[in-house]
C-alpha cells in the first residue's frame, strides 16, 4: 500500500501520446510510511524525501515519503489503457480542486491524495476496498491479495519467466517469487 500511496505525478506517464501508443506506465520509486516521531531521527537522511505535517497536535507518529526498502523495489510498471484513463480523470479532478481551494490545497504531487492534497491513510484505502468487497458480495481478501493475484497472472502470462516477474513485482530475490508462487509454475 505504501508504494501506491507514495506514487507522485512525476512518475506517471499517461500522456495522450503514451495512451495512443499503448505505453502508459508508472515508475515506483517512493512510498508513504507511518513512523514514530522518534524513529524519524533514526532513518537514514537519504531515505526520507519528505515528512508530512501532522494533522493532530500530539500525534506520536508522522507520515513520511521515503525511498523503498531495496533498489529492486524501484521499477517501471506498464499499465493498461483503462487504468491510464482513470489516472487522467484523477489528475483533472485534482487540478479542479487546486483551482477551487487555492492555498488551502497542499500540493505534494501525490496521485492518491485527500481533497486537500494530503496523503491518504492506508486504513482508508483498506476500508474502501472492504466496502467494494461487501457491496459486490466478493470473497474477503486483504489488500496484499491484489499483489499476489498480479504476480500469479504475470507468471502464467509469461510462461513462468521468474526473472521478468521478479523485476516487475519488485521482489529483491528470485527465490522470493519461486517460494511464494512456485506452485503456479508446476
Segments predicted by a language model, with ranges:
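Short, contiguous acidic/charged loop-to-helix segments that flank catalytic cores in large enzymes
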Residues: 65-74, 113-121, 137-145, 154-156, ...
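Short helix/loop segment immediately N-terminal to the Walker
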Residues: 94-107
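Conserved tyrosine-mediated DNA breakage-rejoining catalytic core shared by Y-recombinases
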Residues: 6-96
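C-terminal catalytic core of tyrosine-transesterase DNA break-rejoin enzymes
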Residues: 1-3, 124, 128-135, 145-173, ...
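Catalytic-site neighborhood detector that most strongly recognizes the C-terminal catalytic loop/helix
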Residues: 12, 19-23, 30-32, 169-186
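Extended hydrophobic-aromatic, low-complexity segments
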Residues: 15-16, 28, 36-40, 87, ...
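Active-site lining segments that contact anionic ligands and/or coordinate catalytic metals
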Residues: 23, 72-76, 107-109, 146-149, ...
